[in-house]
Amino acid sequence: MELAQEARELGCWAVEEMGVPVAARAPESTLRRLCLGQGADIWAYILQHVHSQRTVKKIRGNLLWYGHQDSPQVRRKLELEAAVTRLRAEIQELDQSLELMERDTEAQDTAMEQARQHTQDTQRRALLLRAQAGAMRRQQHTLRDPMQRLQNQLRRLQDMERKAKVDVTFGSLTSAALGLEPVVLRDVRTACTLRAQFLQNLLLPQAKRGSLPTPHDDHFGTSYQQWLSSVETLLTNHPPGHVLAALEHLAAEREAEIRSLCSGDGLGDTEISRPQAPDQSDSSQTLPSMVHLIQEGWRTVGVLVSQRSTLLKERQVLTQRLQGLVEEVERRVLGSSERQVLILGLRRCCLWTELKALHDQSQELQDAAGHRQLLLRELQAKQQRILHWRQLVEETQEQVRLLIKGNSASKTRLCRSPGEVLALVQRKVVPTFEAVAPQSRELLRCLEEEVRHLPHILLGTLLRHRPGELKPLPTVLPSIHQLHPASPRGSSFIALSHKLGLPPGKASELLLPAAASLRQDLLLLQDQRSLWCWDLLHMKTSLPPGLPTQELLQIQASQEKQQKENLGQALKRLEKLLKQALERIPELQGIVGDWWEQPGQAALSEELCQGLSLPQWRLRWVQAQGALQKLCS
């Protein structure tokens, strides 16, 4: 076994180191014979110490490179480059985090602006609602007394309606005095009696004395007040139908009494038939209803009663003045012409007084009309505000309704999503998996059979059914060019990997990037070598001729020392700047965060935000950047 291994190593050495073609390669039996006996030690020494010129150059270059890497200056430079690379990566990460923070801040500002606008709208609506509630309370307070009066009137009307539903029987005309009278008939009879007494008190003194009674006469005022109170009580306590029926019953009684009184003289038929004639002639004409006549009469009575007190006062004053003037004229006993002039002057004064009173009354009516118009405008404005507020409330309710509907639809969709996903998996993924599973098993079986024929390929990772059964899958899969070293392209890739110092299992598609990277390193080293040669040539030409070797060495040592000091100072300055940059990164983040919290983030190009437009905010940002750069420098 060891002999075969030595023969194989000898064959590989002949091909790789000595460049022997594969066709001219000695057979394995010959190589075994060479490795027998003392030839084994000789060939072992040759394999260990004899190399091709290319390998020797590679080893020398590696030794020089390792020695160059072991120098403290190079190590320090590499460490600084690594630190600079790390700091650049950190600065890039900080820039990315700043961008993310700016986006988050912009989103938060937008959300805060929307929340602020929503809060302002809510406050305005709440203020409008409070004002509307105050106005409604004041209006309710002002309408409380009219509402109470309307309720009392409604109760009275309901009582009247309930009483009107009850039928009242008055009995026959002959037996009216024997039975009990209804209350409505008794009240109507009392009102008619008081009315008759009032008319007697009103007409009898006129017939006796020829002058009208004053309203201040005791008997006249008492009868008038009694009649008014009785009529008011009658209309308040009894429905109009009962009052009308009672009046008809009393009219029938009076008619019966008149008939009975006129029957003895034979005048009943003639006198009674006379008023019936126009009734027969006018029966075809449509007459107004009794209710309408009563309402119209009481309306006229109310207007006259309201005007009666003022007119009576004015009449009393004017009567007193007139009586005084008449007495004075009678005392003076003027002539007829002077008397006529006096009467005309008195009439003129009366007419002027009436005209002035009418003018004042018209002025009061105009003021009242203007006040009513002002109240009407205020009510119309209130109505418009109420309608606008109602429209806003309806729009808000509609938005809330749509939001609730959208939320319910989203919840329903979210509830249905797991089931839909499961159904989709059952409908599409499971049949596809079942259809692919036999093919994958067949391919796996074929792959296992091919692996038995290719023992040099490491395909263990491809034979795993699942990633979690054995070891995690490798990041680099084996290449197909590693089938066998005897393949035409495989040998070239194997030689390239050996030259680059890569492991033999490296995939061929990854060799070219590694070769390109090493090519860049080679170019960099060549540039450094040319720079050093130029520095050496410049140094040789700048030195005066004839200097001894010792002085040259001293000058070189002093220059190297000065270069080391300059390099050390430059590295210290760089390290100090990096530390300052790391210390000022939080300050930079704070400044940028403070600026992003300003209201300029919500400014648009066509609007002003806190008195500044978007270009002005950008100018402020540029100025802040310049100040920050000065601070960092």
Curated annotation (Swiss-Prot):
Locations listed in the record: Cytoplasm, Cytoskeleton, Microtubule organizing center, Centrosome; Cytoplasm, Cytoskeleton, Spindle
Coiled coil region boundaries: 73-110, 375-403, 551-592
InterPro entries: HAUS5 (IPR029131), HAUS5_metazoa (IPR026215)
Keyword flag Kinase: no
Modified residues (N-acetylmethionine): 1
Gene Ontology BP annotations: cell division; centrosome cycle; regulation of microtubule nucleation; spindle assembly
Broad class of where this protein is predominantly found: cytoplasm
Residues passing through the membrane, by range: none
PANTHER family xrefs: HAUS AUGMIN-LIKE COMPLEX SUBUNIT 5
Quaternary organization: Component of the HAUS augmin-like complex. The complex interacts with the gamma-tubulin ring complex and this interaction is required for spindle assembly. Interacts with EML3 (phosphorylated at 'Thr-881').
Protein name: HAUS augmin-like complex subunit 5
Organism lineage: Eukaryota, Metazoa, Chordata, Craniata, Vertebrata
